[in-house]
Amino acid sequence: MQFKPLLTASALALALGTGAPAFAQAPAANVAASTADAAPAELSTLVDQVDIPYEKFTLENGLDVIVHTDRKAPIVAVAVWYNVGSKDEPKGKSGFAHLFEHLMFNGSENAPEDYFQYLQEMGATDYNGTTNFDRTNYFQTVPTPALERALWLESDRMGYLLGAVTQEKLDNQRGVVQNEKRQGDNQPGGLVFYEIIKALFPAPHPYDHTPIGSMADLDSASMEDVRNWFRDKYGPNNATVVLAGDVSADEARPLVEKYFGPIARGPVNEPAQAEVTELTEDVRTVMRDQVAAVSIDKYWTAPGITDRELTALTVGAQILGGLSSSRLDNTLVRDEQLAVSVSAGNYAWQRVGILNVSATARPDVDEAEVERRLDELVAQFIAEGPTEDEVRRAATSTVAGTIRGLEQVGGFGGKAVTLASGEVLADDPSFYARQFEILATLTPGEVQAAMQRWMTRPSFTLVLEPGERDGSYEEAAGVAEAAGDGDPAEEVTVTKVRPAPPIDSVAELDFPEVQHTTLANGMALHYAQRDAIPATYVTLSFDAGSTADPADKRGLEGLALGLFEEGTTTMSSREIAETSERLGANISLGGGADRSSFTLSALSANLVPSLELLSDIVRNPAFAQSEIDRVRAQRITGVEQELRTPSAIAARTISPLIYGAESPYAGPDTGTVASLNAITREDITGFKDRWIRPDNGAVFVVSDRPLAEIEAALNGVLGDWQAPAVAKGTKSFDAAPAAPAESRIVLVNRPNSPQSYIYGGQLTSVDPRGETYVDFLNANNALGGNFLARLNMNLRETKGWSYGVRGAPLTNENAVAYTVRAPVQADRTGDALAELIRETGEFLDTRGVTEAELTRIVTAEIGELPGQFETSGAILGAMQTNAMYGRPDDYYERVADRYRAQTAESLDAAARAAIDPDRFVWVIVGDASVVEPQLEQLGLAVERVEMAGTE
């Protein structure tokens, strides 16, 4: 039940300079020349690897069914797409398509409970629903024996929903959606998307409103609207079912006909037609909000996804501002250093699209100069066009990303989504193949012609400046009304009894065999083979992480890691980016509190040159002072943005209160403005020498290539890498805070916030290596760990005060904290916190895990295992986790038996030994003028602090 705008201004993504792990020093191996000279695989060869064969059939009632067979795992993705979205909403009913999507999860006539309950019983993974302008989709990936149950469930809500929809459910989900809207609006830049849509698609254009809708229109939604929408829009002849995974068309057809065939055809739905608008003149708007830096965004309307020029526009946008080596990146960020970030993109929907270019100015630079240069560079690109090399690099990056994504059968972007989106939006499941055919032969002239046609028209410029928010925020009319206290629950009306089919035994997880060897320089190599896609994933993991930061140099690890790709002793940052794009490789740096990691995702056809590039980045970073200053400025802007973002404010505030200010886990891991400014080049090179070195790391690989080939390739680039003479770094976790005598509240005042962000936590004595750790995790699955857990069901599904609540252990190598997070509407902050305290206290005292909860949780955890490890990335992550905690390689195969042995009593004992309900620290980020009087009624000490501008 997720709505995500496809486009936001750059200010919404100011989490700049994300920390990246670093590699240690070695002799400057001469890898740059061979990498740059290596001939990558031909683009046509890569395109040929993107193939999703399918069979399609149509039932008599008009339901289209597409089946793709993929036997790599005993799972099937089930996707149901309806050809209706927010563009089809009548005037005065904005947001209704998305609100109706929520109601589809609240039970149908023969499955009247919350939909997620049935999904967990099946062991489903990757389940959700989304709404955009053009379509509404529902999806889940289930174990193969649960496929029939999933089809029964989806068909019941397609054909037999209305008898289960009540006024109480409508009112509740209205509140949930309005809190989803508040949650988005409450973010810095959260009102920008409304302004973009209003400017580019003025009423009465079908795209003149966002899918989330307006508060007033959501207030007006009625049961009659629900009935009409379902009858008019949700017939089988307006839907497509896609099955992708461990199933054939011959196996699927009888099941689909059995469950969907009897559903009557509905009215013929004619999706709204929409012309691509054109502004009569350039339009400019200035907005202010709690952002750290000025962003300048320019927007042009563009054609929809079926237009022949779509691919050319997308590639052009990548070259201009999407690639790491983009024109805007090279000039505005690297060379002239006028901007801390840039972007460009082509965001296409079914009927229309939006082209966007963006630059976020360095705080010390005149924004007018940034905009002037942005305009000049766009004009220059349109006039000159791209080079052949730029087009090939953009195309290769696109194809490589697609190959990696198609390892997954379902979820938000797997094979089922690819086939369904093509069918529903372009009337062709193979639409992706048509686009790739164009991509494989695309010329610079075609890209230039498309950009000249669409980007020389009048544009909309939106400048977002730091300051007090001046956009209009809309509140719901019934914000102060109680939810969940209305009339008694209405009875479900069953128009046709449809018994649920049984679920056969789910296959046990078959985790790949992990093999171990040692490279020539002594680094451990952990390897598993997966041949679902022609790709190789390599992680170099080092025992560092943000806990390696000195107390007075917080953010050092993140700043250092952010510099490894910004130039080596033989390659510039631009050359690194261009080489990576030619190879279709992706190198990411990160890790977390305890590890720093460098992860390469490579096309196996380009494995050796990709490894050469990775090795050069890890072993030979230049750490040029100019690059340090540039990346430091980016990271400082990121910190300043964190200090304006509710969730980040809460996290930065609570960490030292949980772990103790002296603990390495206290953070903030991104640092402060002062600590980042204090870091020198010597600090950065010292970090690399102490932590990013072969005697402090290990290599993890998942590949379709055999171990012998992988080992030889790694020895070729890492085998001669030796540790420097300086001593390895050490960490100390001796500092531990005294447990608080009682719970307390810290209120961070963030004026004019429509929501409050509640973040509670405490340090536990849980050992992640201990026998009771899994019991603790599943106890939390009853209390706060998933959608059906008590905290979420109370505040979201019963009260309607929040879009989502979660309780979760924050597990690090040397400390485990328990946390609760709940964004809630501002006027219910006190009530919501009181409910969180009550639910947690009762769970840890008189209302522990029930037998029904135990059965549901254990069934779900066992059933989900095959789906959890569908991808190479998931296998790679599990291998690293097992290594860090000293677990056996087959840990995830064994854990099912551990689940089966659990009892309600064992889960209760683990939770009660770990959590003390009377010793929570509760951080609340919200408008103190609204929130503080509510909190004073709870009987806890309240400390009020003002939101920091800088630290």
Q: At which residue positions do the language-model features occur?
A:
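Gram-negative bacterial Sec-dependent N-terminal signal peptides
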Residues: 1-25
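Proteolytic maturation boundary segments
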Residues: 23-66, 248-288, 295, 299, ...
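M16 family metallopeptidases and their MPP-like homologs
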Residues: 66-68, 73-91, 95-99, 113-160, ...
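A common structural junction motif
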Residues: 156-165, 259-267, 375-386, 617-623, ...
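Non-catalytic, conformational "gating/processing" segments within enzyme and secreted inhibitor domains
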Residues: 167, 174, 227-259, 458-459, ...
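Short, conserved secondary-structure transition motifs
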Residues: 176-184, 275-289, 395-406, 602, ...
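Alpha-helical scaffold elements lining the catalytic groove of polysaccharide deacetylases
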Residues: 217-222, 226, 676-679, 684
